[in-house]
């Protein structure tokens, strides 16, 4: 859980690979925002899709925002933009704590676990190390149960909510 009264800013990176970036609604991060709000955490949502000067818009918002915790979602094609976003964020807010969730880290984590179980250091291990160097916390799997622990001081580098043995794993009975 974030500190009492601490604002969390959730960021949707642009999808520059799409002809119309507003075609797909990003529901996962909005559900995460709802969980935070329900827990009494002040939330900002910054949707950078369709914004040509998205880095300047982000920097402007980050300079004025009371948030110290910034969470991003990213699909694999959004990762280059998410990388630019986190780099720009760190330029103007070196105090920021960054969290990455979404489909990309979920898939990278699954491939990483497989490679490690086989004793391999392949593309997934390289990708995981790169993400670990860019973000403070990585959330694999659904973020609804993982966001509060991810925002807590001293959160682990990886929160694996994609592991069926994890209490954060959302099975069909708990998926709402």
Go through the PLM ranges and name each one.
Residues 2-176:
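Acidic, low-complexity intrinsically disordered segments
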């Amino acid at each position: 859980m974030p500190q009492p009264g601490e604002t969390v800013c959730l960021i949707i990176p642009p999808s520059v690979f799409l002809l119309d970036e507003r075609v797909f609604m990003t529901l996962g991060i909005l559900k995460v925002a709802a969980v935070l709000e329900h827990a009494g955490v002040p939330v900002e949502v910054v949707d950078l899709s369709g914004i040509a000067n998205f880095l300047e818009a982000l920097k402007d918002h980050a300079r004025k925002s009371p948030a110290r915790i910034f969470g991003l979602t990213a699909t694999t094609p959004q990762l280059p933009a998410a990388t630019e976003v986190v780099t720009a964020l760190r330029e103007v807010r070196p105090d920021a704590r960054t969290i990455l969730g979404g489909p990309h880290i979920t898939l990278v984590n699954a491939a990483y676990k497989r490679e490690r179980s086989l004793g391999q250091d392949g593309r997934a291990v390289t990708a995981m190390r790169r993400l670990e160097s860019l973000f403070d916390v990585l959330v694999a799997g659904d973020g609804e149960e993982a966001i509060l622990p991810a925002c807590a001081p001293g959160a682990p580098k990886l929160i694996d909510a994609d592991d069926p043995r994890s209490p954060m794993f959302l099975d069909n009975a708990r998926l709402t």
